Structure formats: C-alpha cells, structure tokens
C-alpha cells in the first residue's frame, strides 16, 4: 500500500466489507502493520486507522524469525523447543519400535515443515532435530543410553532400499525449495513476476547464480535449482525460452 492516509482508510473499509460479506472476523488487535521510509512518520495515524500496533523487524512467524539475514543455528531453537515439548508428553517406554516410528514420521518430522518450506535450514539445526528423533527412536525415554544398531542415515532411506522411510530433513528441505523453483518457472503470478523482475531480468533460471546481497529465500532457491535441473527435463517449445 502506498504512503497515503486516504488510501489506508479505503483499505480499512474494504477489510470491513470483507468481514460483512464473508462472515469472518479480522482480529486487528493481534495484527501488526509495518511502515517503511517516509511512512514511518505517519505510523501513529496508520495505527489508529487500522486499530493495530506498528511492528518492527525482525518478527517471528510460526516461531521462525522473519528478516533479511541468513538463518543461524540459534534461529532453530523455537522448533527444538516444540520437539522437546512433544517428547516430554510421550511415554516412549510404553511404545513399541513401530509406535515410535509412527510418531516420528507423523508428528516430529512435521513440526519443522514450515521452516523447511521457505528457508535453507543450517546443517546445525537439522543435526539437532535429527538428534531428538534418533534419541526417541533408540532410547525411547531419552534417559537410559542404548546402543544404536545402525546409522541414522540408513533409517532415513526408503523401505524398499532397506531403511525405515524416516523423513530425511535435509533432502526434504531441498525438495520443498525446488518446488518454489518449479512454480517460478511454470506459473505466472504476482510473486513470480516480482522475482523475475528483481533477479532474472529477462534471463532464464539456468543463467542466474547466487549474488551477494540476495535475499535468504532467493539464495535457497539458487541452491535448490541445481537439484531440480539435474532431475528435470526442459521442453523446447518454440525456442523463445531456450538458450543454446
């Protein structure tokens, strides 16, 4: 939205109309708005119009810090705490190996899915999450140490290859980021046009590389694109998007 108080009032009317037509309620008291540039000087006026607070960066969404910097190992602490909270309520000693395997795949592995979907997650964070999953699988109660019969990497291989099919978080991270690369190439929406104008600039995805100053999200896409291009096929079509 442009830095215009009248436009802000019109936006508030549209949001109120949305509430009336949809029957849904927007909780403005729990919402935050962010002002940039000259709009910061009118932050108080915008806050009064929308009835919400003015937020500052970085902020957290689903436990993950939203900022322009690369994720650090400390940024995964919230997800670790969610792991610990889940594990503290489970009685591993009362569960069979199969029961613990089901909980790992259906619950623990999904707690970090939002972070894996949007960011290149540091290896240190992934190792910590694997530590909690491995400890629950082998030690059940997390206190008495037990000998591990095989490497964790073996357990994360598919069942038809001799593993247990436990989700490989590093591989899942790369696959989820590759999904955004595929959507960028194959679909045409607002966010696709934004990224194309900012980063591609009339080039194809194969011609651009990571550059200093790129956003953390785009840096993750640049690393994931190699996996996608290596396993994918490109349809030439009329040749307008093909580089030889």
Task: Name every feature range the model reports, one short phrase each.
Residues 1-244:
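A helix-boundary/hinge signal
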